[in-house]
Each structure stands twice: as C-alpha cells, then as structure tokens.
C-alpha cells in the first residue's frame, strides 16, 4: 500500500476524527501539521491536482484570515490563492488525506474510506 499522509490540525474535530478512522483501519499515516509545516506552492499545486479541485474549492471562506484580507477577489487566480494559502495556512481546508496520486478532504471524515478501500 502507498504511504498515506494527512494534513492535520489536532485542534479540529473533523481532523481528529479522520485520523482516528485511519488508525481504526490499521493505518498510521504520516501526519503533517500544515500550520507549522506550510506546503510550498508546488505542493499545493500537487494537492489540487490530486483532489481534482481548483484551489478555490478547498479553501475555508469562513476563516477570519480569508475575510479580513478580502481573499474572495482572488477566487479565479490560482497563483494568488496558493500565495494566500502559504501566507494564511488556516484557510486551507482540513484535513486532507493523500495516497499516491489521489487525495480527499475529510469532511465528512468517512470520505477517507474512498481512498483506503
């Protein structure tokens, strides 16, 4: 089986629940605290491709950083969105679970089963 990574924030219930589902399935993923180890622009592009989503679809529009910095004006500009994700990593949707060339957002946490089945 390919290694599994999780972009994780232990402060958030969905992230903890997704991690627990992986562990309950006897999978110990590589845990990346994306707030401390912020993905590079190349990593963000790769994640976007693996999710098969434009970055505007996996940012948290309800986050303070998103609202306070008027980031909505960049929804059609991938580079500016990636730059914003690097500068304000809290706007990155979480958790993101990656396996090989596929990734899912663990909202709801059970989405992880589509990746590990």
Describe the predicted segments one by one.
Residues 1-25, 29-34:
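Local sequence-structure signature of Cys/Sec-based thiol-disulfide redox active-site neighborhoods
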Residues 36-117:
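Thiol/selenol-based redox catalytic cores and closely related redox-interacting motifs
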């Amino acid at each position: 089986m390919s290694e599994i990574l999780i972009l994780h924030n232990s402060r958030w219930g969905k992230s903890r629940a997704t991690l627990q589902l992986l562990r309950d399935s006897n999978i110990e993923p590589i845990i990346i605290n994306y707030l401390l180890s912020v993905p590079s622009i190349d990593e963000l592009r790769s994640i976007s491709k693996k999710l098969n989503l434009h970055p505007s679809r996996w940012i948290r529009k309800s986050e303070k950083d998103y609202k306070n910095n008027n980031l909505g004006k960049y929804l059609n500009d991938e580079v500016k969105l990636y730059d914003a994700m690097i500068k304000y990593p809290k706007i990155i949707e979480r958790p993101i679970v990656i396996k090989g060339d596929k990734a899912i957002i663990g909202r709801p946490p059970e989405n992880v089963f589509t990746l590990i089945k």
